[in-house]
């Protein structure tokens, strides 16, 4: 089964949300307190997905707000050089800064992230700064859950979703749950559900679906049946090493294994999964193959130091799939 898009649209994907700075520990197997050296990368789930999509050959655009400083200029320059259209990146004029994420790599199984997300520029994107024409020209709008955490970013995303629905643009909701950006589980569930019920494709881990449903121990069947009662026609639920599942509204279920790799760190997997899965759908591959692309891409990224810089090419993904098929 294949997923279809409006081929007349100029952009394959437009992502909206945060673009920030990742500072990844260069020294492995030691705590943050003893780490002295970090490498700088562009970070943030929607930015990573846009970068990953562009590296795979898709026409990708980005809507977001960046600081008017060296970090903001680094983010815009890096994304533009990787092929992402940055004409809708708004430069903040009120002194807000970029979000910073310091990563600690104690072991492949034990990684943590120290986040600085107070008063960050990306959460100050205004609804008036979202271009209807830009979104109307995309096959899909990629929404990140974290962008719903605070106003005015929350309203900007809801406005973007309205524009997408108006212009027959597919809405892809990447749940991207980060607990440190939310006030309560009730708040998260309300806004996640609001967007998920307007989305055509919903992607997340089983734990993230439980967060959206404000419950524990939920089942895939209950989750997809609820979403299929609204706008969704494709739901992807990831189960870590057990692999991932895609459910279509027509009743088909697809599964992809988790590909074996030498794991360096655990972060970055979700963003690489989403970009490669989306690439698979847009390039005309069937849903099962798109799942394999997502799973293989995630395996590649967790074996490397960065997230954005490590996003693989289609050839690298295909080589891994072939090697383990």
From Swiss-Prot:
It comes from the Bacteria. One of its GO terms (molecular function) is 5-dehydro-2-deoxygluconokinase activity. It catalyses: 5-dehydro-2-deoxy-D-gluconate + ATP = 6-phospho-5-dehydro-2-deoxy-D-gluconate + ADP + H(+). InterPro entries: Carboh/pur_kinase_PfkB_CS, DKG_kinase_firmi, Myo_inos_IolC, Myo_inos_IolC-like_sf, PfkB_Carbo_kinase, PfkB_dom, Ribokinase-like. One of its GO terms (biological process) is inositol catabolic process. Its EC number is 2.7.1.92. Catalyzes the phosphorylation of 5-dehydro-2-deoxy-D-gluconate (2-deoxy-5-keto-D-gluconate or DKG) to 6-phospho-5-dehydro-2-deoxy-D-gluconate (DKGP). Belongs to the carbohydrate kinase PfkB family. This is 5-dehydro-2-deoxygluconokinase. It comes from Bacillus subtilis (strain 168).
């Amino acid at each position: 089964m294949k997923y279809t898009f409006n081929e007349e649209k100029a952009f394959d994907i437009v992502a909206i949300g945060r673009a920030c700075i990742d500072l990844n520990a260069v020294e492995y197997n030691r705590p943050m307190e003893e780490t002295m050296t970090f490498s700088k990368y562009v970070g943030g789930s929607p930015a990573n997905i846009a970068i990953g999509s562009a590296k795979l050959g898709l026409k990708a655009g980005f809507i977001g707000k960046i600081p008017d400083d060296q970090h903001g200029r680094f983010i815009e320059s890096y994304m533009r050089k990787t092929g992402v259209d940055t004409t809708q990146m708004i430069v903040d004029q009120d002194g807000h800064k970029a979000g910073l994420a310091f990563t600690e790599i104690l072991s492949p199984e034990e990684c943590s992230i120290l986040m600085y997300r107070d008063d960050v520029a990306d959460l100050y994107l205004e609804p008036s700064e979202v271009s209807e024409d830009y979104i109307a020209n995309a096959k899909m709008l990629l929404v990140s859950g974290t962008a719903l955490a605070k106003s005015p970013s929350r309203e900007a995303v809801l406005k973007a979703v309205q524009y997408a629905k108006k212009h027959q643009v597919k809405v892809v909701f990447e749940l991207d749950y980060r607990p440190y950006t939310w006030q309560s589980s009730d708040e998260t569930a309300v806004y996640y559900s609001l967007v998920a019920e307007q989305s055509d494709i919903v992607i997340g881990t089983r734990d993230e679906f439980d967060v959206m449903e404000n419950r524990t121990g939920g089942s895939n069947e209950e989750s997809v049946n609820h979403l299929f009662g609204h706008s969704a026609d494709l739901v992807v639920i990831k189960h870590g090493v057990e692999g991932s599942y895609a459910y279509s509204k027509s009743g088909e279920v697809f599964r992809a294994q988790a590909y074996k790799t030498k794991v360096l760190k655990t972060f970055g997997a979700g963003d690489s999964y989403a970009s490669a899965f989306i690439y698979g759908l847009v390039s005309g591959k069937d849903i099962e193959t798109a799942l394999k692309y997502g799973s293989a891409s995630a395996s590649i990224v967790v074996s490397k130091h960065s997230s954005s810089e490590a996003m693989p090419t289609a050839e690298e993904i295909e080589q891994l799939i072939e090697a383990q098929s």
